[in-house]
């Protein structure tokens, strides 16, 4: 069973019921909805299709709402686009105008106050570069360094600048409330800069009684510098290499990726490696060798999940991309020395009961050659505690709550399983083993290690280990 989870962005190439079914059967664990594109009505219809198919297939596929975040974009151009030449003057303005090859409007009104002469401005993921020469009223007068085609709503990056724009825009707030209403399991907070940004998102969720898990997207230098504090208040991070590769020098992206994975693993948090993992498969049925190696290296480093963006949203081969990603992941996972990895993680064991029990569960399972670790959990916390130590055997996350099973589907190595409610803890444990057997995860004669928090239902308390032989 594959341990690393796969996230697929849903778009025109994958939003039909037929394609969603194929993606889920190919191995998609989480469906990502990019709220930079599409109306609420369009997103609602996509969500309903995902929900319909996951119920039909009885698979705990989770949904992730990816916010726009505090981004800066160009506004519209006459004819939809314009050509910029190296060396020419180009003006960015906060005035409401239709763009031309000489000037264009930007979405962030106060950009002129956050930058100065000499600042570098990048457009369209860095394909177009310009330098600020002067600021005159509402106009930012720039010299084009690298020219090219600019078009409607292309992204604008200002590497290294500390922007004063609020973190949650009115549109983002509406999107978050929409996500709460629809029942998304995860929320990706784009361009997270500091822990206060995540706490602001958390307060909206708490205010509306939502248990959505928050994934902080690290995409700029502020986020990188504040990574530790962001991790401490979020449920995980996404290594968003697209905008990160524009905001920081390209050669530093691999270094930052490794640091982010290492820090997230140490804190027992989700870490999603994203962007261009199988970029060539947007047009080709086979990936490059470099892409295969990129995926494998992220898995060797300990990433929780790997993500497809354009490959699954708009590519010619979305299902093949998922199958390819799954095969590469399984191959890398077969090569990992889990005992050695656990010994490295042992330094992260804390003195509290939960982490001590979680680590002991993993070492017991490894020493006994257990077929599986079975966690009986209401919220998914116990499974999360076990997952952080990345044992070699499968972790079966048994819960009576379908929503918890979907949230567990992003946990490394965890196979979620919904079981029926029982009157006693003992009956629940027996039912968990029986359901694991029925699902084919274990068989008669297997040794399994059961762990849970007793009494059940108190989140954040894992305090029991039991070793049993499956009857």
Question: What are these language model-derived features?
Answer:
Residues 1-471:
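Non-catalytic helical/linker scaffolds that mediate oligomerization, partner binding
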């Amino acid at each position: 069973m594959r341990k690393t989870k796969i996230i697929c962005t849903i778009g025109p190439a994958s939003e039909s019921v037929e394609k969603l079914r194929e993606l889920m059967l190919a191995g998609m664990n989480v469906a990502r909805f990019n709220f930079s594109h599409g109306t609420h009505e369009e997103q609602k219809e996509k969500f309903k299709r995902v929900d319909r198919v996951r119920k039909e297939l009885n698979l705990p596929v989770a949904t992730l709402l990816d916010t726009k975040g505090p981004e800066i974009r160009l506004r519209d151009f006459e004819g939809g686009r314009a050509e910029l030449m190296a060396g020419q003057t180009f003006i960015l303005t906060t005035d409401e105008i239709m763009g031309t090859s000489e000037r264009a409007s930007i979405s962030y009104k106060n950009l002129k106050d956050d930058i100065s002469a000499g600042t570098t401005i990048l457009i369209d993921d860095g394909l177009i570069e310009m330098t600020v020469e002067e600021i005159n009223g509402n106009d930012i007068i720039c010299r084009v360094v690298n020219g090219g085609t600019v078009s409607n709503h292309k992204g604008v990056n200002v590497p290294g600048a500390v922007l004063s724009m609020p973190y949650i825009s009115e549109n983002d707030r509406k999107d978050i409330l929409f996500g709460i209403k629809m029942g998304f399991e995860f929320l990706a907070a784009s361009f997270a800069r500091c822990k206060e940004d995540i706490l602001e998102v958390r307060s909206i969720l708490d205010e509306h009684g939502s248990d959505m898990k928050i994934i902080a997207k690290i995409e700029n230098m502020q986020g990188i510098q504040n990574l530790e504090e962001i991790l401490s208040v979020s449920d995980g991070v996404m290594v968003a290499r697209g905008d990160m590769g524009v905001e920081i020098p390209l050669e530093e992206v691999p270094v930052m990726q490794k640091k982010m994975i290492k820090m997230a693993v140490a804190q027992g948090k989700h870490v999603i490696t994203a962007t261009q993992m199988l970029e060539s498969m947007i047009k080709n049925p086979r990936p490059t060798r470099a892409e295969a190696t990129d995926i494998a290296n992220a898995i060797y480093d300990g990433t929780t999940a790997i993500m497809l963006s354009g490959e699954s949203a708009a590519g010619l081969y979305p299902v093949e991309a998922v199958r390819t990603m799954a095969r590469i992941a399984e191959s890398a996972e077969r090569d990992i020395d889990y005992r050695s990895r656990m010994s490295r993680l042992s330094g992260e064991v804390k003195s509290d009961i939960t982490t001590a029990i979680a680590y002991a569960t993993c070492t017991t399972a490894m020493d006994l050659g257990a077929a599986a670790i079975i966690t009986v959990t209401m919220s998914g916390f116990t499974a999360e505690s076990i997952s952080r130590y990345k044992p070699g055997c499968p972790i079966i996350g048994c819960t009576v709550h379908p929503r918890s099973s979907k949230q567990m589907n992003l946990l490394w190595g965890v196979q979620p399983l919904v079981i029926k409610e029982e009157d006693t803890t003992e009956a629940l444990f027996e039912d968990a083993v029986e359901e694991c057997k029925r699902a084919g995860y274990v068989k008669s004669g297997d040794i399994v290690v059961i762990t849970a928090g007793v009494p059940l239902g108190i989140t954040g308390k894992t305090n029991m280990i039991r070793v049993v032989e499956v009857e």
